[in-house]
Structure formats: structure tokens, C-alpha cells
Design a protein with these regions (language model features):
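Sec-dependent N-terminal signal peptides
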Residues: 4-13
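Sec/Tat signal peptide C-region and signal peptidase I cleavage site
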Residues: 15-19
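Local sequence-structure signature of Cys/Sec-based thiol-disulfide redox active-site neighborhoods
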Residues: 21-57
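Short amphipathic alpha-helix with an adjacent loop that forms part of the alpha/beta core around
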Residues: 30, 74-75
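Structural micro-motif
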Residues: 75-87
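N-terminal post-signal-peptidase region of extra-cytosolic proteins
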Residues: 65-70
Length: 123
């Protein structure tokens, strides 16, 4: 019963985080400080391999490392795309690309991890 209530509350309160927005050095810290936030680090020259997932129960932001190399260095981004899931400003999960610069984690995998973070709040 408890799980059913949690699932229903997640469905009712879920927000789809598509229409991703770009963040920069100036607003990065304030944006990731909010609840569950997904940040995709990518490069404009590799836009074809960008994930840009439409996920629920999170905010989704993009960082172009060719413009914000300080963020690339701070978060040790060595390959792109790299997707980091933050919870209240703290890195929780990191998804890395394969040798073809494509993200191995699909949308379903990333969403599952976000859902687990959400459910953990109720335990």
C-alpha cells in the first residue's frame, strides 16, 4: 500500500523535463542545488551524439564544454556526452560515453535511477 501511494504521488507530481535549457558558470551552482537535476555535458561539434533525454521528476540542463571549460575541468569531464545526476547539489550518478562518443545509458536506464532517488526520499 505504501508503495502504491508513493507511485501515485510520483505520477501526479511528475514533471517532464524536456525543452532542456543551457546553463553556464554563473548559474550552474544555483541550478543544481535544486532537488534532482540532470546535467548533460556535451560539445557543439558532437551534437549528433548528445542524449537530450526527455525525463520526468527532474530538471534537465545542458552545458557546452567548448564554451565552459571551467565546468568541464571542475567536474572532470574527459569524454562527451557525460550525464551527471545531482541531488540537492551533490553528484549522485554519472553516465559516461563509450569509445564511439555515444552514451551507453539509454533514457530508460537514466529514468530508473532518477526514480530510485525519488523513492529513496520516502523511505
Amino acid at each position: 500500500m505504501k508503495n502504491l501511494i508513493i507511485i501515485i504521488s510520483l505520477l501526479i507530481g511528475s514533471e517532464i523535463c524536456f525543452g532542456q535549457e543551457f546553463i553556464n558558470t554563473d548559474n550552474f551552482k544555483s541550478k543544481v542545488a535544486k532537488d534532482i537535476v540532470v546535467v548533460e555535458f556535451y560539445a557543439g561539434w558532437n551534437d549528433a551524439n548528445a542524449a537530450k533525454y526527455e525525463l520526468t521528476d527532474c530538471s534537465y540542463y545542458l552545458v557546452d564544454i567548448s564554451q565552459y571549460m571551467d565546468l568541464q575541468m571542475k567536474y572532470d569531464i574527459t569524454a562527451i556526452p557525460t550525464v551527471i545526476v545531482f541531488e540537492s547539489g551533490e553528484e549522485k550518478i554519472r553516465f559516461l560515453p563509450n569509445v564511439m562518443f555515444k552514451l551507453d545509458a539509454d533514457k530508460k536506464t537514466v529514468q530508473k535511477d532518477i526514480d530510485e532517488l525519488m523513492l529513496a526520499k520516502f523511505n
